[in-house]
From Swiss-Prot:
Pfam families the UniProt entry points to: P-loop_SecA (PF21090), SEC-C (PF02810), SecA_DEAD (PF07517), SecA_PP_bind (PF01043), SecA_SW (PF07516)
Catalytic reactions of this protein: ATP + H2O + cellular proteinSide 1 = ADP + phosphate + cellular proteinSide 2
Entry similarity comment: Belongs to the SecA family.
Gene name tied to this protein: secA
Binding of ATP, residues: Q87, G105, E106, G107, K108, T109, D509
Annotated EC: 7.4.2.8
Any Gene Ontology CC annotation: cytosol
Function description: Part of the Sec protein translocase complex. Interacts with the SecYEG preprotein conducting channel. Has a central role in coupling the hydrolysis of ATP to the transfer of proteins into and across the cell membrane, serving both as a receptor for the preprotein-SecB complex and as an ATP-driven molecular motor driving the stepwise translocation of polypeptide chains across the membrane.
Chain residues that bind Zn(2+): C890, C892, C901, H902
Species for this entry: Acinetobacter baylyi (strain ATCC 33305 / BD413 / ADP1)
Protein name as catalogued: Protein translocase subunit SecA
Amino acid sequence: MLASLIGGIFGTKNERELKRMRKIVDQINALEPTISALSDADLSAKTPEFKERYNKGESLDKLLPEAFAVCREAAKRVMGMRHYDVQLIGGITLHEGKIAEMRTGEGKTLMGTLACYLNALSGQGVHVITVNDYLAQRDAELNRPLFEFLGLSIGIIYSMQSPTEKAEAYQADITYGTNNEFGFDYLRDNMVFSLQEKKQRGLNYAIIDEVDSILIDEARTPLIISGQSEDSSQLYAAINSIPPKLQPQKEEKVADGGHFWIDEKQRSVEMTEIGFETVEQELIQMGLLAEGESLYSATNLNLVHHVTAAIRAHFLYHRDVHYIIHNGEVIIVDEHTGRTMPGRRWSEGLHQAVEAKESLEIQPENQTLATTTFQNYFRLYKKLSGMTGTADTEAAEMKEIYGLDVVIIPTHRPMVRQDQNDLIYLNRNGKYDAIVKEIKNIQETRAPILVGTATIEASEILSHKLTQAGIRHEVLNAKQHEREADIIAQAGSPDSVTIATNMAGRGTDIILGGNWKAKLAKIENPTLEDEERLKAEWERDHETVLSAGGLHIIGSERHESRRIDNQLRGRAGRQGDPGVSRFYLSLEDDLMRIFAGDRVVGMMRAMGLKEDEAIEHKMVSRSIENAQRKVEARNFDIRKNLLKYDDVNNEQRKIIYSQRDEILAEHTLQDYIEEMHHEVMVGLIANFIPPESIHDQWDIEGLENALRVDLGIEVPVQQWLDEDRRLDEEALVQRITDEVLARYHARREQMGEESAAMLERHFMLNSLDRHWKDHLAAMDYLRQGIHLRGYAQKNPEQEYKKEAFNLFVNMLGVIKSDVVTDLSRIHVPTPEELAELEAQQQQQAEAMRLSFEHDEVDGLTGAVTHHEVEEQPIVSSDHIVPPSSRNAPCPCGSGLKYKQCHGRL
């Protein structure tokens, strides 16, 4: 109330921002007559002039009015499009490192060219980030003529691109690509063996298209490059026979003979006592568990992992909802966009369990080699901005996590779409029948209809019902993504009915009357007559659709995010066009079933509604919106929590990657190696000669043996002490270090500077990468169990920081020890051996392909692409010796029962 009163007096923050930017727009418009008078050559020559002025110290802010005026004039001449004033405001917003919320169809792609052009003048590169390869390619090719006219180069990055092409794309003034590809290139750049292999030239400025999808929906998605671990395919296949014999328990706290309880919110399962006993018996019969042995003993934790994955695969992940089968592979379906994600795989053995369930070939599990999150990757950019049709509902999160303000850009023409109230039915069948009936009614007006569904399953049920009703229609879901552009291009034609799974991120406008240019492109060698005919047909169809009320949007289910619902609605009413939208819901919808209050559901059931009857009530609509707010708040908390923990990992990641860059950049690493020798010697000697100890406590024999075994060097420590009794601890350390270094220098001289430097670089990078990989696994295990510290009255976050720091320090010590040991024990290599070593490094670098993991916290779903780099067992967590009963207190000291703590699945 108070906020709205103050806003009414002083104007909202958004209104004040728009008022300030309109003054800059006035400056741009004032330059238009002068810029329009320039010849093409003079207009193109403005770019080198701006670059020179920038290099002499003029800021981009100062150049903005003139640069925007030049870009607008160039777009007018090259593309036949002139930026509206609202697009200029959007361009200013992007340049200032903010998020521009612009309605669908208002020209976000054209708006982005302004900020791209201005920021490319710095010569440091601009990255334009999209949600898929199709949009990156489309936008780059659409804008290429404009930027090339202005003297700027364009690059496109994509997966499986040759190293040369990718390097050239990153050297371009403006580079287009997907968020995944940019993120993976960053990780890959920090796994190379020479600076020349790096592709990215720094993270200067990024414009993220569909910014809410990338920074919100995929924020808790770690990017992971991984390698194969041990093969457990036979075990997955064997355990797959167990879940069909089990029954879920209906409620968590009410024992009803069920074997496990399902938590749909967390997408996790917890075994009951009966479940444990049943599974144990099954495993004993299979010969996987010895008679009298317990499933929850420390040695059988691997079996627990497999059983859990199998139950989740059978009861929580369903075909044509969470995944599809294509060419004998399980392909994940993105829950936010409805797109398939080829190559991505769920983690924690879930993907293998689904493959076993579907009787497909089971691929091996993976181990993490390098990882970051989108949250931390995008915060590395010096300046970040974004554009979307829907960001205002997540404005607080954008500000808190990324420091990005959201500016709502006014529409060029007033929005006249009618958003009608939701209709709620008793069950899904009644809802689907009502949708079919409504489609029949709308078809009488010849208006185009877009039906949005949340799952592939729902789209196919509706498609079946429409077919039975004799209604012609198109289906756009993960199974038809190859025809996506064609389907969307004609979705605005009269009489068209299109069923689409989650329109979020589709990135293509639906033009009322259809897209005559798309039809023309399909004609081989089109003539001018063809063009005129198609234009005339479109004008006739366009008028038909306008008179029918525009595009009609039917939502078959509310998404858990209001923003996704708004994106579906936003497909209608573009640029002042008419349109209608309405959502059809049922009590069986996941959002209603899981999150809506029992009181609302009970009240609706008590009303005695029939299957074909609907209610339309503000209280129910409010309840649905509150449910969505709860889910959004919960997901925000998860993302914030992920960031808290990943910030710890991120600081360590920065140190490791910085150290890697130093190793690659230095011509010689001799100083580093000598320093390492000294540190390692101090640590090694301290194991046998404790600091500030007396001679009687010294283990000289053990020290000499360690030097012989670890470093391959004979050091007569006892002889030195016999010869000089005054030799103290400090002097002894120095003398041993000098002896080891003398041997190192002699070998170095024998190899020659170039060969020695290459060998040192190889050992340092190899040790760093190997132990960093193991450290990531150890950090994963630490994170999975750190919440248990809360039961011991400790702060899990602080405990995580402390433990992570100790792990990191230990890792650095082990890396140094490894390098010194390897360099001490290796024989002087021949030129042929050095050449072979270099070839191996090249093969390893070329073998690195991206893999991608969704590994969401708290058991939420995730995906990982597996790529075999080398076979390595995953570091195991500390074992907890189980008590005699699962109801006994857990030995970890948490105060919980064992079954609710370390014995929990």
